[in-house]
Amino acid sequence: MACAAARSPAEQDRFICIYPAYLNNKKTIAEGRRIPISKAVENPTATEIQDVCSAVGLNVFLEKNKMYSREWNRDVQYRGRVRVQLKQEDGSLCLVQFPSRKSVMLYAAEMIPKLKTRTQKTGGGDQSLQQGEGSKKGKGKKKK
């Protein structure tokens, strides 16, 4: 245990991990959501979390091929993990407004809906409607 205490908080493997499932309002707490559903975001991606965190000035890097262990869907859309540096070499906070991992997650969930990629995706939802009704043909009752 003394070995872990001697390691610097500025090393990349000491950065906190944020998976998209932590912020996803489609997930239950058992499935991995870590913030209240009222503050969660619909299907966030790791790149969106990275964009938001790096824009505020946090030291961030993206690991694209990492998967959250509770994520059953192995699709590329659900892959990725973001590592964020919370503490500097001397143990002090990088940014005072982010004292904990939960504060970073809440901030990311608040800012992701304001991204340009999210605000421009509002059009084109009517394509799923079917144009015509098919005539009902089926087998009749068997005649005796």
From Swiss-Prot:
UniProt-listed GO biological process terms: SRP-dependent cotranslational protein targeting to membrane, signal sequence recognition
Keywords in alphabetical order: Cytoplasm, Nucleus, Ribonucleoprotein, RNA-binding, Signal recognition particle
Keyword field contains NADP: no
Family designation: Belongs to the SRP19 family.
Function field: Component of the signal recognition particle (SRP) complex, a ribonucleoprotein complex that mediates the cotranslational targeting of secretory and membrane proteins to the endoplasmic reticulum (ER). Binds directly to 7SL RNA. Mediates binding of SRP54 to the SRP complex.
Assembly mode: Component of a signal recognition particle complex that consists of a 7SL RNA molecule of 300 nucleotides and six protein subunits: SRP72, SRP68, SRP54, SRP19, SRP14 and SRP9. Interacts with IPO5, IPO7, IPO8, KPNB1 and TNPO1. Interactions with IPO8 and TNPO1 may be involved in SRP19 import into the nucleus.
Xref: Gene3D superfamilies: Signal recognition particle, SRP19-like subunit
Protein's organism: Canis lupus familiaris (Dog)
Residue ranges of the region described as Disordered: 117-144
MF term (GO), any: 7S RNA binding
Protein's name in the database: Signal recognition particle 19 kDa protein
GO CC field: nucleolus; nucleoplasm; signal recognition particle, endoplasmic reticulum targeting
PANTHER family hit by this protein: SIGNAL RECOGNITION PARTICLE 19 KD PROTEIN, SIGNAL RECOGNITION PARTICLE 19 KDA PROTEIN
Subcellular location: Cytoplasm; Nucleus, Nucleolus; Nucleus, Nucleoplasm
